[in-house]
Regions:
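Anionic group-transfer/hydrolysis microenvironments
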Residues: 55-58, 84, 99, 164, ...
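Conserved active-site beta-strand-loop modules that form the wall/rim of enzyme catalytic pockets
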Residues: 111, 161, 191-194
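Active-site cofactor/substrate anionic-group-binding motifs, chiefly glycine-
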Residues: 75-85
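Canonical P-loop GTPase G-domain recognition
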Residues: 84-151, 169, 281-283, 289
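Alpha-helical scaffold segments in soluble metabolic enzymes
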Residues: 119, 123, 159, 232, ...
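Helix-rich effector regions associated with P-loop NTPase G domains
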Residues: 1-50, 58-59, 64, 71-77, ...
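Structural beta-sheet core signal
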Residues: 53, 79-81, 149
Length: 316
């Protein structure tokens, strides 16, 4: 089979799979338990002093549920940029400026190592200092600061709670939505925390948001076509972190540039580089590169930090 025939087959396959892959505006899913959780959050907010919202530092905008942002807008808030260890430190500085300009407190965190935990506690107590003093003046001594922690699935919320509470009570897993039941957790003598399950929005209106969530593994790998997700990541890295990609997969820079300069559709050039990575990693099935296996190993490398420190988006 020559290259022309292979391209024709891939084009036909891409056309057949288009309903599953892009555009992301066609993705309309909302598990029933998430609708129930949203209603519960609205009810619980009545007794909450401070909202701690956990975002993924690699995708601060895409990992912020606009629905949750709207229903918590009148509450004091601390923004946690979690998974900071996996993010691009230079780009994160721009995000810090962005949130500060919006009048929000920001903490850089890594829930796996405990980075940012003490700073989060300090910010919660600082933001409530005046209110607690007013309560004390009125004789309400010993009243704890009530904090709600929110975030979409798979941003490291359970690990963060375990760190801040010095316990392992919250069930932790790699799959979205693993923590489902409401629970109050004592942080110290001044703070008690209400955990909530992760909530995604009903429909992804923005194609980039949907793809960023897929790349980081926030939504399940069967929501979007895996090869499309890996393709998008490779394209982004070639434009922004090419040296990371070349180094990880021992790719020859001249060969990659030659492929990219070929007089053919851009998607064909990127696909050839995916094939090259598959060959390098031995992702072969029946004598040919296994696209799905190649896509999975590329995404796994990104999610585990093996492709380096990367942030996928910048403030607008």
């Amino acid at each position: 089979m020559d290259m022309y025939q292979k391209r024709k087959i891939r084009a036909e396959k891409k056309n057949n799979d288009s309903q599953k892959s892009l555009p992301s505006t066609s993705i309309n899913w909302f598990p029933g338990h998430m609708a129930k959780t949203r209603r519960q959050i609205v009810e619980d907010l009545k007794m909450i002093d401070v909202v701690v919202e956990i975002l993924d530092a690699r995708i601060p905008n895409s990992s912020q549920n606009p629905d949750i942002r709207q229903i918590t807008q009148n509450k004091k808030k601390v923004i946690i940029l979690n998974k900071y260890d996996l993010s691009d430190k230079a780009k994160i500085e721009k995000w810090i400026e962005y949130f500060i300009q919006k009048g929000q407190k920001v903490v850089l965190a890594d829930s796996l190592t405990g980075r940012g935990i003490n700073e989060t506690i300090r910010q919660i107590q600082k933001i409530m200092e005046d209110d607690m003093q007013k309560m004390a003046d009125k004789g309400r001594i010993g009243r704890k600061i009530r904090v709600m922690i929110v975030g979409i699935p798979n941003v490291g919320k359970s690990s963060f709670i375990n760190r801040i509470s010095k316990k392992t009570s919250a069930e932790v897993g790699n799959k979205p939505g693993v923590t489902k039941q409401k629970q109050w957790i004592r942080i110290n003598e001044k703070i008690e925390l209400l955990d909530t399950p992760g909530v995604l929005w009903t429909k992804f209106e923005n194609e980039n948001v949907a793809m960023n969530l897929a790349i980081t593994g926030t939504i399940k790998d069967d929501i979007l076509e895996l090869t499309e997700v890996a393709y998008t990541l490779i394209k982004f890295m070639l434009e922004n972190y090419s040296s990371n990609l070349l180094q990880r997969y021992s790719l020859n820079e001249e060969l990659v540039n030659e492929i990219l300069s070929q007089d053919q559709a851009e998607n064909e050039n990127i696909y050839e580089i995916m094939q090259l990575i598959g060959k390098k990693r031995g992702a072969i099935l029946g004598g040919r590169v296994d696209d799905e296996r190649t896509s999975k190993l590329i995404l796994d490398d990104f999610r585990s930090g093996k492709l380096g420190n990367i942030t996928l988006e910048m403030p607008e």
